[in-house]
Amino acid sequence: MELGQLLPALLMAAWLLPLASFVVIVLLGPKLGKHGVGASYIATAAIVCSFILSAIGFIGWCGTFGAVGAAAHESGHAPIVAGHEAQAAEHQAESTGHAEHVPKLTPPKSFSGVWYTLGSFGKLRVTISYYIDSLTVAMFCMVTLIASCIHFYAIGYMHDELHDVVDHQVVLSDGQHLHRHGRFHRFFQYLSLFCFSMLGIVIAGNVAMVFVFWELVGICSYFLIGFYIERKSASNAANKAFIVNRVGDFGMIIGMMALWASLGTFSFGDLSDADGKVVERGIFSQVRDPANNYALLTPPGMVRAAASDHVASIVRDHEGAGHKPIDAEMEIQSELSGWRNQGYGYWLLVIAGVGIFCGCVGKSAQFPLHVWLPDAMEGPTPVSALVHSATMVAAGVYLTGRFYPVFAPEVLLVVAYAGAITLVLAATIAVVATDIKRVLAYSTVSQLGYMMLALGVGGWVAGMFHLITHAFFKSLLFMCSGSVIHATHTNEMPMMGGLRHKMPWTAYTMLVGCLAIIGAGIPFLIGFSGYYSKDAIIAQALSFWHHNPTHGAVFFFAAAGGASLTAFYMFRLWYLTFAGVPRDHHVYEHAHESPKVMYMPLVVLAVFALAIGWSFPGVIGVADWLEQ
């Protein structure tokens, strides 16, 4: 079987397994073992199998296409995937001002197709389709691996939910604490649906399908952030996350409608029939036409929509003269180039890009819609680890990267400024926070700003590379913080201190995470994963400054200053928690290392946080992979 047939089948199975787990747990629930403990085994087995299938797809892709060139082109700039198999979109010099024009581009590989057509409404086909390239495969491996570790971790962390629970944070009107039944099976039920939704976004082949799973991710986050629904803080946090994201989604709908009304399709790549003939041109190939060497070009549909008065005038003139409709169409086609040169339709391209990015601003907690993410820590720590690393917040950055070929230079400038403001603002707040999970929450907001900044200044590879490295070390950091909270029953770092003696596994795996997020390394020799991805971002910002002095200085100093703040607040967190002497002896005396089912996933993630950025001669690295 060829890779073009095998890969969609593998990834479809990997995508649907968490859905099957969700359905089984919904139907059987508490009947799955004693107190529903079997729900965790089913959910964990499903996501582990998804990872295995994704890894097989990864190996198949490597075996077929191999690696390319030097990591990240030394600047994090890379071709942008667009189109079906032999089509791609390249971020050109005119869109960023710093990429050298390539006379003839060699497009990266991608596969697109339709699994099922739900219905046709005029020219609009609503389909369940796929779009698979190197980014899709990398995201599948990352999401399923991290989710697998979190599932194992959650088996230990959520064990209290196997029995009746006394919630000491909820006081009833009679002064008693809340007593309720455990919700162990329900937690894994939501977790499975969450993973299914995120994988649906990644594999989706059209904007409509993305939007469905985009909203499903939002619903799952509402359920999981508000898991302790009786707590007012959790209820408010869930509502806040849901409502703030709807603000961004309103803009996303506007962007979708601009694309559909002018281009007549929701598909990313071109769709072909059984004979290989293109039956529907996708968004990417219309915006970055292969005939135009994949340079950004206002599509004919947008030009016609913007010049509708001229089009109507031509049609009326030909009808009045008794000409055939084809004569009017030929004149319209001959006028398109002139209208495009006059700027017709370009504003539609900008509106579509800004609209799509508005949805990404909400999901990835960018300024000014960043306010929901720090409160998302009200959910159980495994939820925080998943939300802040591989699923919800990653979706916004992923979609920005996926739509990259569509973004005009003005849109990329908006992306860069949003990222720069977000990364500095969140980092300054993290410096003074005392709640261990809140520090990590603001750290997530700041790192997402880094990714958006990279994308805005033309560093597609750098931004996507940091998305993947960040997912590993941030999930590790959140799970370590959960291990601390599980042992000490407090989130406040001033009440901790000296815990490395009681929790060595947690302490030193968290140290690895801290070193990874600050980008520690020995220059020109070796470093933690963040060393490579952050270096690519800062190098890209410097290159942008060199070619765009008007805006570039802001982005470079934001990236460099944010890196310094990150180093400060992360080591402040580690020292306050694990170093020094105990500041609250009651907390210290009751502290203990987490069970093996909780700290072994930390070790696995620590290895990836250390080495996911490495690249060896003859072995494909993540940056090389994304270059495809």
How does the language model describe each region?
Residues 15-30, 361, 365:
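N-terminal signal-anchor/start-transfer transmembrane helix
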Residues 24-41, 158:
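Membrane-interface helix-loop junction between the first two transmembrane segments
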Residues 58-114, 269-280, 526-527, 531, ...:
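Interfacial/capping segments of alpha-helical transmembrane domains
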Residues 83-194, 311-312:
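Hydrophobic alpha-helical transmembrane segments in multi-pass integral membrane proteins
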Residues 149-166, 170-210, 219-594, 608, ...:
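Hydrophobic transmembrane alpha-helices and their helix-loop junctions in integral membrane proteins
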Residues 215:
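Short phosphate-coordinating micro-motif centered on Lys-Gly-acidic
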Residues 591-628:
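Hard-cation-handling environments
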